[in-house]
Amino acid sequence: MTTTSAFMLNVRLDNVAVVAIDVPGEKVNTLKAEFAAQVRAILKQIRENKALQGVVFISAKADNFIAGADINMIGHCQNAQEAETLARQGQQLMAEIQALPVPVIAAIHGACLGGGLEMALACHRRICTDDVKTVLGLPEVQLGLLPGSGGTQRLPRLVGVSTALDMILTGKQLRARQALKAGLVDDVVPQTILLEAAVELAKKERLAQRTLPVRERILAGPLGRALLFRLVRKKTAQKTQGNYPATERIIDVIETGLAQGSSSGYDAEARAFGELAMTPQSQALRAVFFASTEVKKDPGSDAPPGPLNSVGILGGGLMGGGIAWVTACKGGLPVRIKDINTQGINHALKYSWDLLETKVRRRHIKASERDKQLALISGSTDYRGFSHRDLVIEAVFEDLPLKQQMVAEVEQNCATHTIFASNTSSLPIGDIAANAARPEQVIGLHFFSPVEKMPLVEVIPHASTSAQTIATTVKLAKKQGKTPIVVSDKAGFYVNRILAPYINEAIRMLTEGERVEHIDAALVKFGFPVGPIQLLDEVGIDTGTKIIPVLEAAYGERFSAPANVVASILNDDRKGRKNGRGFYLYGEKGRKSKKQVDPAIYKLIGVQGQSRLSAQQVAERCVMLMLNEAARCFDEKVIRSARDGDIGAVFGIGFPPFLGGPFRYMDALGPGEMVATLQRLAALYGPRYAPCEQLVRMAERREHFWTNGETDQGN
């Protein structure tokens, strides 16, 4: 229990009560069940003070309002009834705030999410700052839940049903101007005058009722509502493939509230919250949330990180440009790019310009902020400006002698403490460091494409990499907004190693006659964001298959792909989306056109293209190989823990989050079931499915990857 209250009441001389929210000992405000008594005590004082003109809720934290409710509360619930009770308690508290007899204003700066936004919705008006840190949303769906403290009922009545459905079903976060346009907030002001603006609004005796736009009023009526909900159900089912029960319950609860009234809506919301909290999907999604939070706190090693004030990048291509952007614009670090010609430097600069200009157009940042961030990036065709760089990231071609040459040049032109980080996806870091004068300062830092979107990076120390080099590189990755996992220096590292057999099997099924769209649809239905064939097209067929010979040389035949198929496709100049033709055909750039499977692909690989396997059989063949390889990586200590393996797969390749990652999924299936399934597939399709020793041992001992002490709760 906290001894200091998280909610402090101060009555100003002008008779406006200011309630400051400041959870003791925490960087971020989150709502906990034990705060209810504190809030009620303050509400009692407010009701008893007849001289009060209004109330303002504001955060005392530097950059957040309330980031949500403490998710650990849900994990403590033993059954659906306890979770439902938790929701009803939240609903009651919000109702008491809404029922205050004077104007109540939420003054919002920073993150206002989940339970924080539900509290703001219970206030009579909302004002927020124009700061980039200010975002408002209800992200509970991302944890397999719905808003449980009245959010499903208040939001549709405030912003309209279609806007509310979009926000709650996606968990999207609105920036200040978007929130103002939607009617979620009443005003947007600079942070310096937030409190005074809120106080002035609180002093107004009568707050005008906001009128919904005509479109929203039509959709709220019986006919418009019926049409809207029918369309939303259909679209949501297509998107979720039935894997996320929370989305269907969200639609039901919002519809109930609009059709039968708020009281029925609140009842439905609390019941749905309780039931969803007990679903395996919500438990898995919460586990992913806690695991990712832990990974972000993990320093990578016990050593303190070295200096990290500026970064160099070798290569201005697609990866180099993306790395420059996340380093400068996310991390706030000065970046110097070296390329063999000015064209490469200009490409990297344009990469950042385009991303920042899009933000300016969408009014996410001001032009002055764009210029400030761009000023952090500079370039050169030689090593001028590199002498003081603390870390240099190499993003040149996958050529070992070239990368070794880069190491030598950096050691010659940079400081003695400078770290050399290679963005290789396939070459051993130990080989890259083989001729280094300071091998302890050489490390792998594997980004995924597109760099600005993919959240994961693999940090790969080789045998001689120092603990400080690891810590410094992990620190950089976090500054870049990435989630880093430390993996061993073995062929394919972790993510590409478990991805390769999955894609290989999809190609193998193509050679057996299965249709491209059938294979992709089967894996999307299983829960992946895109199918394996489409993924190969997106990555680039030439790029995606380059690692297969490396893995086959290291691990043997289980990594062999139908070589003639890959060769035939590449020889036909099919690289995927980047050149407009792969397994799919793509329209002209800039034109919206649906991708279509190229029927010529079947003739090219010598098959008819007639599917014989069920979607479940297709998914099983691909996924079981991925799981088996993940278990091998665990056994060989390629990954440090099941936690890192789950996060790597979910964030790196889109492994279905509602399954919790490959290791939680294998635990759910049970090692005995895993071994039996792999043995059955091995009998049908060959020894590549033979269960690895790790799984066989675990089946014999009835062990799990996640130990009993590791729950779906945070520490």
Curated annotation (Swiss-Prot):
Q: Give the signal peptide range.
A: none
Catalytic reaction list: a (3S)-3-hydroxyacyl-CoA = a (2E)-enoyl-CoA + H2O; a 4-saturated-(3S)-3-hydroxyacyl-CoA = a (3E)-enoyl-CoA + H2O; a (3S)-3-hydroxyacyl-CoA + NAD(+) = a 3-oxoacyl-CoA + NADH + H(+); (3S)-3-hydroxybutanoyl-CoA = (3R)-3-hydroxybutanoyl-CoA
The protein's GO terms of the molecular function aspect are:
3-hydroxybutyryl-CoA epimerase activity; enoyl-CoA hydratase activity; long-chain-3-hydroxyacyl-CoA dehydrogenase activity; NAD+ binding
Keyword RNA-binding on this protein? no
- Sites annotated Important for catalytic activity: E118, E140
Q: Which CDD domains match?
A: crotonase-like (cd06558)
Localization annotation? Cytoplasm
Give the EC number(s) under which this enzyme is classified. 4.2.1.17, 5.1.2.3, 1.1.1.35
Alphabetically ordered keywords of this record:
Cytoplasm, Fatty acid metabolism, Isomerase, Lipid degradation, Lipid metabolism, Lyase, Multifunctional enzyme, NAD, Oxidoreductase
Q: Where is this region: 3-hydroxyacyl-CoA dehydrogenase?
A: 306-715
Cellular component terms per the entry's GO annotation? cytoplasm
The record, for InterPro entries, names: 3-OHacyl-CoA_DH_CS (IPR006180), 3-OHacyl-CoA_DH_NAD-bd (IPR006176), 3HC_DH_C (IPR006108), 6-PGluconate_DH-like_C_sf (IPR008927), ClpP/crotonase-like_dom_sf (IPR029045), Enoyl-CoA_hydra/iso (IPR001753), FA_oxidation_alpha_subunit (IPR050136), FadJ (IPR012802)
- Major location, coarse class? cytoplasm
Extract one GO BP annotation from the record.
fatty acid beta-oxidation
Tell me the segments the record calls region Enoyl-CoA hydratase: 1-190
Is rRNA-binding a UniProt keyword of this protein? no
Query: Which pathway, metabolic or otherwise, does it act in?
Result: Lipid metabolism; fatty acid beta-oxidation
User: Which NCBIfam families does its entry note?
Assistant: FadJ, PRK11154.1
Family as reported in the entry's similarity comment:
In the N-terminal section; belongs to the enoyl-CoA hydratase/isomerase family. In the central section; belongs to the 3-hydroxyacyl-CoA dehydrogenase family.
Subunit structure comment from the entry: Heterotetramer of two alpha chains (FadJ) and two beta chains (FadI).
Q: What does this protein do?
A: Catalyzes the formation of a hydroxyacyl-CoA by addition of water on enoyl-CoA. Also exhibits 3-hydroxyacyl-CoA epimerase and 3-hydroxyacyl-CoA dehydrogenase activities.
Protein name (record): Fatty acid oxidation complex subunit alpha
Which species is listed as the source?
Salmonella newport (strain SL254)
